[in-house]
């Protein structure tokens, strides 16, 4: 069925209205086309300008490369304005679409009318050709129906059959004209499709260029941020550099002050610290230079990127010019094709416009999504700003902590300087006393100067070796400090790796320290052997003195069977010339030291068990002070035993049970051995065999460095009151300690009847051959691998200058701190008492009158007379102090080096 025609009011009016409507529709379409193209171009340029301004405008970006809250507010306002403009644009597009729909409906109506007219005209032409026209009335009706609303509607209905040829020609011409119009419409539609494709390609290129511009702006912002961060780092590095320079200046000033006060060793350490800090400054300067080079490179990159941005802008301008030219061409072509447009084109265009409207709506949705994403990015940027602020606060807190640490270090340095000043004052006082004694003893020391010179040579050689070892220790300390700095720089690594790395380094350092300690012990063994020989010579000289019956000192001293002096304090002296009185006495036939670290009662035995020689336990001053057990150990008629018994100069009672004192003032038992305050048995040489939980003194096998016990193989507690006495006067009971005929030490090792060790191996020569292979010489003291003596608490107190303090602290080879007040008790004559007196193993000062009590021929009397078994001077002379001072300086240097180490290394060492 054919569609029914629409009947117009009048044929002439319908033609005019149709033409007017077509002209109006074409005008609207061209205007919309031009407006759409111009709007797209302006929008693209606006977006470009906005993006460029967002990336390069200094008003919207801060100096640090991050957005401020004002910028965020401006961005939000711009987004709102853009949303409003987009809504308005959508409303205008909808109105235009409605108008175009109306025009399309009109054109469709006209199309149907033309199709009906063509149908009737073709039908009439067929009938005319066939000759079946019928009656004239029927032919006229067909023509009137065919040409209603058509351009041929003005034809009269009263047609003659002779005029049918003209009418058929006109119909054929109109039909041919309609075909040409259809072809033109199809060509225009194809051309529009090509133009749309070309426009889409151009829009894609424009979008890609806009994306590149946006990315370049983002990269520029990131580079600006990085530049700002690098500038802040440079400022921080410069501030750190200035602080380090100030610290270096302060250290130089301290060095200049310390040149007049401190010894050479500490000046060397301070100079080395200065060198280290200078090296650190140089390294920091190198780092700063590298950072500056990086900044220059980044600036060059920014310049290159700015050039690229300019080139891209030029490309965009060129493309805009091309688009404008193409738009001009399109306008010209549209002007040519306006006359040829018809219904099919408009239908297709309207369909395309509808599709474009859908696409535009989708684009608007995408733009809204982009706006939401931009808002999310702004929130993320705000979060990043907050995180950066927190990081800056953390860095400030760290800087405050570093300042506090530096202040604490300065306070420690000041305290150390004060301690050194006090020590120097004490040394000056001692030197004054020594000078007074030297004036008295110059005549007697002339004979011993040759021996002393030989010893000085040996001591210098040993000092040189010790200095070399100290230099090695300093190098190791430098390596340790460098390692610690590296560890501070690498704190961001996992903690497990750091722990493993630290453990490996500590093991290596411990191995190095063990090797150095073994070397030091070997040297100390050599020194101990030389000391043994020297003691044997002293013993021989003492035997000569005993046969000669020398006189006692100036302070009404008691003289025993061997002619020994008993001092101003009426101390009791054994048959071997040893001091066994109120405090710091020796208790061996060979004059070995039994009082440097523990208290000894009237019989020469150990009266404390595990007593200390520090500043906080017993008082050893000149005024009748306390000596561990509450007894008085002063200068006149004092008590010296554990039970309050008197030990005077005239052979008074010296035992706990009021026993009789023998020729030497001590209690004499069945085997001619001395009996102490606790009733314990003492051998013929006056050695101690009794109570007191003694412990071993060897440090070779003990890896636990707290000195509670030196030898892990043979350390057993000795319980008092259960000892047996053998045929030779030695103890061979439950405690398994023995005192042999040679007067060996019975507190540190087990000794059998022959004087040798009753442990794993026994030698026939009377020396100690225990598990640690220590040798006990004629003096009875423990002479192990490191030539150290064994005190009451298991500490080392021997020739190596080891520590023997109240807390059982570490006793190394460097003369470390031993007392609760920070005083030393090493081999070099360090301070051990509250009054500044010395109580070491090298013949140091221990009494009120400046007397020596050590094993090397010490002074025990009030007048400075010598009573020791191996004394260098007989009446008022002790060993030369130069050797002791040199050894003390070396020991102090070691102690300073160890104290300079961090607490973690001190605990490990």
Curated annotation (Swiss-Prot):
Compositional bias segments (type: Low complexity): 746-755
UniProt feature, compositional bias: Pro residues: 1-11
Keyword set, alphabetical order: Coiled coil
Record field: compositional bias (Basic and acidic residues): 13-31, 78-88, 425-478, 524-542, 872-892
Biased composition (Acidic residues): 607-620, 757-766
Ranges of Basic residues composition bias in the record: 692-719
Ranges annotated as biased composition (Gly residues): 641-654, 676-689, 791-871
Keyword Glycoprotein: no
Coiled coil: 192-526
Comp. bias regions, Polar residues: 53-77
Region ranges (Disordered): 1-88, 300-362, 381-408, 425-494, 524-909
Family: Belongs to the GOLGA6 family.
Record-given protein name: Golgin subfamily A member 6-like protein 2
